[in-house]
Amino acid sequence: MRLALGIRYNGQAYEGWQSQRSGRTVQDKLEAALAKFAAQPIGTLCAGRTDAGVHALMQVVHFDTTVEREPFSWMRGTNRFLPDDIAVQWAQPVPDEFHCRASALARRYLYVLSQSPVRPSLDSGRVGWSMHPLDGDAMRAAAALLVGKHDFSSFRASACQARSPVKDLRRIEITRVGSGDRCRWHFEFEADAFLHHMIRNLMGCLVRIGRGDERPEWITEVLEARSRKVAAPTFSANGLYFLGPLYDAKWGLPAEATLQAGGAPYDGPP
């Protein structure tokens, strides 16, 4: 039997998703909890491998098992053995042809940025920070130049293992929440797939433009250079959330994971 799970986690305490020798990763904690509940080893695959400090609203994983339980039991039983900052949101049997990564039609991320003269305290680790006021119109103008199918080599980490730097960036929405010198900015990204550190590198450039350090058209120069050296430094992981992959409704997953329903809504820090 193949089972899919929707996972939500706060990534502050972890060295990313992927299993490490230290055992301090989300995958390590999840597989340990699944093994305790199922009384057998279970290996998982995920839709998107998040980096250290990155959060997830709807990570999707799948695994194969001979253990037969009701979906609700998988959710409740696994959560019993998980730490408080990781929780299974749903469990769903899927056909053997389903693959959480290969079957995804799109992926969505959100960056939450606090604009304030004072660094975040209560939301430390859950939002990024800019002490400088940002120009939303300038950032949106730059974002519009990024949308489409491009070679994103300038926004790719040196350790990126993707076969191709060409990705279809389908949407960037930038929304201001609040007014004055203390507000939040939400940057939502949707693409067929993302390169390693791609969003954090895009954020570094967008914030530089928002501060007025570069004009919006500069982003095109960075894109066309296809060189990491010309882009802004990689932005903090603190405010980055994996909103989740989107699948065809034929797989029978919950609405928050289907393309037709638009995916999971963000309900983190306002």
UniProtKB/Swiss-Prot annotation:
Keywords: Isomerase, tRNA processing. The lineage of its organism: Bacteria, Pseudomonadati, Pseudomonadota, Betaproteobacteria, Burkholderiales. This is tRNA pseudouridine synthase A. GO terms for molecular function: RNA binding; tRNA pseudouridine(38-40) synthase activity. It catalyses: uridine(38/39/40) in tRNA = pseudouridine(38/39/40) in tRNA. Formation of pseudouridine at positions 38, 39 and 40 in the anticodon stem and loop of transfer RNAs. Homodimer. Disulfide bonds: none annotated.
